[in-house]
Amino acid sequence: MNTIVLFLTLLILVSSCTSIVMKSSNSKERTYPVTPALNPLTGQHSLRQRQLIFCDECANACFRRKKPVRSCQRFICRCAIRDVGY
């Protein structure tokens, strides 16, 4: 009986801390990593072509999360905080 009460108390504390962390992380800007698909021809692409491929994959990653692209510069992908909505 005592173990059950202790377990439930611990569960409530962990869930409340998790909700607080999630709420604070939603207010900050999120940066999503984009991993390009492995391609043996990547070495043959110019820097500009690789950047275009990266930004295309960045846009796809943002749209999968229903977020517009905020920026794609120097191989850093940033999605906007707001959702895409009509």
From Swiss-Prot:
Membrane-traversing stretches: none
GO biological process, one term: killing of cells of another organism
Keywords attached to this entry: Antimicrobial, Disulfide bond, Fungicide, Plant defense, Secreted, Signal
Endpoints of the signal sequence: 1-19
Keyword Phosphoprotein assigned: no
GO CC annotation terms, alphabetical: extracellular region
Localization in the cell: Secreted
Protein name: Putative defensin-like protein 211
